Amino acid sequence: MGKYNLILSEYLSFIYNSQSAVQIPIYYSSNSELESRCIEFHSKCLENSKNGLSLKKLFIEYNDVIENATLLSILSYSYDKYNAVERKLVKYARGKPLEADLTVNELDYENNKITSELFPTAGEYTDSLMDPAILTSLSSNLNAVMFWLERHENDTAEKLKIYKRRLDLFTIVASTVNKYGVPRHNAKYRYEYDVMKDKPYYLVTWANSSIEMLMSVFSHEDYLIARELIVLSYSNRSTLAKLVSSPMSILVALVDINGTFITNEELELEFSNKYVRAIVPDQTFDELKQMLNNMRKAGLVDIPKMIQDWLTDCSIEKFPLMAKIYSWSFHVGFRKQKMLDAALDQLKTEYTEDVDDEMYREYTMLIRDEVIKMLEEPVKHDDHLLQDSELAGLLSMSSASNGESRQLKFGRKTIFSTKKNMHVMDDMANGRYTPGIIPPVNVDRPIPLGRRDVPGRRTRIIFILPYEYFIAQHAVVEKMLIYAKHTREYAEFYSQSNQLLSYGDVTRFLSNNAMVLYTDVSQWDSSQHNTQPFRKGIIMGLDILANMTNDARVIQTLNLYKQTQINLMDSYVQIPDGNVIKKIQYGAVASGEKQTKAANSIANLALIKTVLSRISNKYSFATKIIRVDGDDNYAVLQFNTEVTKQMVQDVSNDVRETYARMNAKVKALVSTVGIEIAKRYIAGGKIFFRAGINLLNNEKRGQSTQWDQAAVLYSNYIVNRLRGFETDREFIMTKIMQMTSVAITGSLRLFPSERVLTTNSTFKVFDSEDFIIEYGTTDDEVYIQRAFMSLSGQRSGIADEIAASTTFKNYVSKLSEQLLFSKNNIVSRGIALTEKAKLNSYAPISLEKRRAQISALLTMLQKPVTFKSSKITINDILRDIKPFFTISEAHLPIQYQKFMPTLPENVQYIIQCIGSRTYQIEDDGSKSAISRLISKYSVYKPSIEELYKVISLHENEIQLYLISLGIPKIDADTYVGSKIYSQDKYRILESYVYNLLSINYGCYQLFDFNSPDLEKLIRIPFKGKIPAVTFILHLYAKLEVINYAIKNGSWISLFCNYPKSEMIKLWKKMWNITPLRSPYTNANFFQD
């Protein structure tokens, strides 16, 4: 337990190393006698430090506290405002500072010039192109590195090598930063003009990325990659990541498959010892050589050499180094361009008339037919979702920006806001709400833009459309997605699958007479050529669908949808350029519509089908699979003869030629053994994921707190680690210390202990052991959890005032009236709460809640409230179960081959013993009969929490609940009187518990929980028919066994003798479990 607390204490003495600095530990205990000693200890410490006395005697006198109580937090005093960073940095700044080459980047502002050269005056300055957008500072990052270096300067052997590598890299960063001085951040963690004017513009974001990279160096190869990227990314802010990661699309085609996993009929991964040779035409090698030459031209030396060396034998054993380079390239940080350049990028493409009209016609028709296929059933049956599409849209309206700031009145309060949900309420109150009229987005009302920044690609623009577009599209898109959910071609949406399933699908059909064609169509999605055929295909489909029904409301829904497409064919955008706002006619498709993902998938499927139908005129093959996944599509083609180099070359050139006939600037490749798409890549029959999540730079600023960001940082670290990019854990923990500390006054700071940050309470930030989610069951853990729960629900005056206004109340009751057929408090309260929660995205409200949260936390961290919350958490349930289990040693042999080489050893071991799973465990209740019954008659979608509440009510209350949602009385009666209802009780409880235990997150999502190998380690005699209890006992046992194996690399077996008398008690408790939302769970959710 003590690792974090130990580092915390060392970190504090490192930061506050002056005479005046004091650290006062604060302890607590659930034992009341010990607790009073804790309080005594704390007050004496305060007393002594006020009088400047040493605390050493107290530590001896109160040894019982230190030994037996739990550390709650550390209070630290320091009177010198520290310019400590600068002082410490000098020690490391012994190298030659980097000089930026100011000619590397095409766009002037992407060169790392001194800020005042890019922005001559403060008025012209913007930090938007280099804002790290994270609530931690460069000085903190430097401190964290220097702390690590100081801690490890006496390391020996292998550890010493790591120390030297990192020291060497840090010398580069320190020397460069020191040359200009450490940029000081303001209260919002932004870097202002007067701080930056005499410094290179990209200094901060470069230094953050460099620190992230150097703290991820372990081996010599890591060191070479990092050094090269750190040095070159100082100058090259535009193309470096792209150059370094480009070769991967070809590398995956070079490795022979010798044994792989394939998907079998049951959709499970099954080992196949097939051998498939990589057939690579010379042309491919020429393209690869060209890529390596481009890298060398950009000044890269070691990285192209590593790739070159690997090419001698192209072995899968050494491939992880290629995967490593590919992942590392993303850690140079985000490429952030000016909005004008991002928008013009798509408009620069030459528009030619010289295209194959026949292909375009086929493409449009395929889109039309797919739209019809997706919507035919719901339209013919006058689906209620299409009838009440407006209500459905309002219920799921987001609280994102509506594109303009308006003055809104809520009761006596007048506020300015851009939020969609607030605009809808305001419009309704003032009779301006007209969902039947889709506002134009032409030259008179150009679309405001958002942005999407990503490493290694150009900035993309996002439409911020008026909320009418969302309402018009929502219901129809939901129906499209339901269709996509049971259509395997749509890899991204396919029901409950995960990426392992898609992996097995590809490898399944690879053989000596097959080839796989994979295309990155991101350029096509945003090209002007796509927009007319794309929108027209959708419009034609909608026209045909409108003739399949006589229901006026369904026709109206389809017509409004059609109108959004017509309007967007003539779209203008507004782009701020300096102080002017430019209006530009924008003839391409941009994200921002509700339909973006669904429609792009349809279009990409149509595109690859069009291309394949052309190719099939010339070759004879069977298409074994076609898949589309976001911006990528791929297909496996089976020929009747063995594939030769010449064939691969010919097919490849014909495919490219075919795309060119449509003027589609896409990257199309053909291989016999592997593919590379944005989400994953397959090489040598194994699956890899890009570990490219940036830790110390963020894409954009949201309204998350430092605590939230600390949790996201940890969560990102875990995802990277599972994907093969490991950052030093001590460094991550140091960052968490910095980001979770709370300032009381200028010289007084409070640092929460590991117990506070890892107990699953509303404040949880990380796990004390990577990959293992612990649910504390000791007295002290449960005590602190209870104490935190008593602090829940921070109020916001502004939110309460808005919620009390007639505008808000009328809106909520309007929704309830339209939705409900009779009174239903659960649903009405739910809607009101959801709407109130949406207000959180309005900054003043989230600020107010944050302040309340922090002051509550401060009280708490100095002395836990003795208030006992009576709520039951999952911890209580597990605590009741634990005593009845007995542990014995066990042995499981490794029986599966590795197929995900980047996994950490301990996680890999578990998969090799018990196997993996290719599906997501259902944790939202959507498969239950009651959920299906509701969606059959109503547009309302109850959450798993609500279903869990409802299903445990009395039968007549469940009937009333159903009837109020418009379910016919006969169906409600049948449901409650049937067996299905009791099955549902069990099913929903199961889903709810899975949800609470985060079974689909972290590394748990990789394990097969129903593995017979795992089952045989668990023995629970069957007593009485309470399936829910049996379920929780088994699940607890499985988690215990797996957690033990992750931690110790060996297996245990569990025997449980659960008394029958306790079962009913436990069962009753299980219907009152309170869910806990924390920064940690939000971060998990955010990964999704």
From Swiss-Prot:
The keyword Nucleotidyltransferase applies. Residues 501-687 form the RdRp catalytic domain. InterPro entries: DNA/RNA_pol_sf (IPR043502), RNA-dir_pol_4-hel_dom (IPR042032), RNA-dir_pol_luteovirus (IPR001795), RNA-dir_pol_reovirus (IPR007097), Rotavirus_VP1_C (IPR022071). It comes from Rotavirus A (strain RVA/Human/Indonesia/69M/1980/G8P4[10]). GO terms for molecular function: nucleotide binding; RNA binding; RNA-directed RNA polymerase activity. Its EC number is 2.7.7.48. It is an enzyme of class 2 (transferase). Interacts with VP3 (Potential). Interacts with VP2; this interaction activates VP1. Interacts with NSP5; this interaction is probably necessary for the formation of functional virus factories. Interacts with NSP2; this interaction is weak. It catalyses: RNA(n) + a ribonucleoside 5'-triphosphate = RNA(n+1) + diphosphate. RNA-directed RNA polymerase that is involved in both transcription and genome replication. Together with VP3 capping enzyme, forms an enzyme complex positioned near the channels situated at each of the five-fold vertices of the core. Following infection, the outermost layer of the virus is lost, leaving a double-layered particle (DLP) made up of the core and VP6 shell. VP1 then catalyzes the transcription of fully conservative plus-strand genomic RNAs that are extruded through the DLP's channels into the cytoplasm where they function as mRNAs for translation of viral proteins. Belongs to the reoviridae RNA-directed RNA polymerase family. It is found in: Virion. Gene3D superfamilies: 1.10.357.80, 1.20.120.1390, 3.30.230.140, 3.30.70.2480, Viral RNA-directed RNA polymerase, 4-helical domain (1.10.10.1990). One of its GO terms (cellular component) is virion component. Keywords: Magnesium, Nucleotide-binding, Nucleotidyltransferase, RNA-binding, RNA-directed RNA polymerase, Transferase, Viral RNA replication, Virion. This is RNA-directed RNA polymerase. Pfam families: RdRP_4, Rotavirus_VP1. One of its GO terms (biological process) is DNA-templated transcription. It comes from the Viruses. Its main location: virion. Its cofactor is Mg(2+).
